[in-house]
């Protein structure tokens, strides 16, 4: 139901039941380092190109969110994915191994919110029961696409914009679920679970009027 000029309220609530994050080494060194599920040391993830590495980040994020939910692709109705690259190639190849209908979305820095809004609409409308939303970026591939390719050797101050190397994935459902716990300490495996009890899950809604 439309609320105001820019907001939508769903009659059927939609929940983020699980979330996963995979980031590069620089992100792991920042103030949020202990909040990520996986911090990798090799930003290339043993791939041959930055674009392939970004795809690998997406795949890992989706794998982790499904592992947290104890589910598999057969139980997922739709996968919404997006990235910063031309033709969304990171998403196309990153999700290629998942036998799930895939819709690619592009919203630059708003891609995460865009996938969540669209995924929630599918569920609230009764067209899907479980939807995975995933987005990614990679510092090196973004530099190549929008700024100065690393091979150019451009000098950059530490205060300049730095695109995240990482990926985030969410599992949406029309039914709430419980997550194991909320922790503030990074484990040795760099894995972290965070969730909220089912009775406190709020439906996804755009509250801006």
Predicted regions and their residues:
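Short acidic, glycine/proline-enriched helix-loop-strand junctions
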Residues: 99-102, 143-156
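Active-site-proximal alpha-helical scaffold in enzymes
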Residues: 106-133, 172
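Conserved "HGTGT" condensation-loop signature of ketosynthase/thiolase-family condensing enzymes
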Residues: 1-103, 162, 168-209
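A short acidic, glycine/proline-enriched capping/turn motif at secondary-structure boundaries
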Residues: 85-87, 109-111, 138-140
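Short acidic/polar capping segments at secondary-structure boundaries
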Residues: 136-140, 145-147, 176-177
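Short beta-strand segments
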Residues: 82, 131-137
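Short, conserved acidic/polar surface loops in the N-terminal third of protein domains
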Residues: 88-94, 114-116, 142-146
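A generic local secondary-structure boundary/capping motif
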Residues: 3-6, 120-123, 155-161
């Amino acid at each position: 139901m439309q609320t105001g000029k820019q907001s939508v309220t769903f009659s059927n609530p939609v929940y983020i039941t699980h979330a996963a994050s995979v980031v590069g080494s620089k992100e792991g060194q920042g103030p949020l380092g202990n909040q990520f599920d996986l911090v990798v040391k090799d930003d290339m993830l043993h791939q041959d190109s930055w674009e392939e590495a970004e795809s690998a980040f997406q795949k890992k994020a989706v794998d982790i969110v499904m592992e947290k939910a104890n589910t598999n692709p057969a139980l997922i109705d739709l996968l919404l994915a997006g990235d910063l690259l031309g033709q969304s190639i990171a998403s196309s190849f990153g999700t290629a191994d998942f036998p799930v209908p895939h819709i690619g979305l592009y919203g630059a820095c708003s891609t995460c919110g865009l996938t969540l809004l669209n995924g929630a609409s599918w569920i609230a409308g009764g067209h899907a029961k479980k939807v995975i939303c995933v987005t990614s970026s990679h510092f090196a591939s973004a530099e190549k696409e929008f700024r100065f390719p690393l091979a150019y050797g451009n000098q950059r101050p530490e205060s300049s914009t730095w695109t995240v190397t990482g990926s985030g994935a969410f599992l949406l459902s029309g039914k709430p679920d419980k997550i194991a716990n909320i922790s503030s300490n990074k484990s040795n495996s760099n894995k972290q679970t965070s969730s909220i009890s089912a009775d406190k899950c709020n439906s996804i809604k755009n509250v801006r009027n």
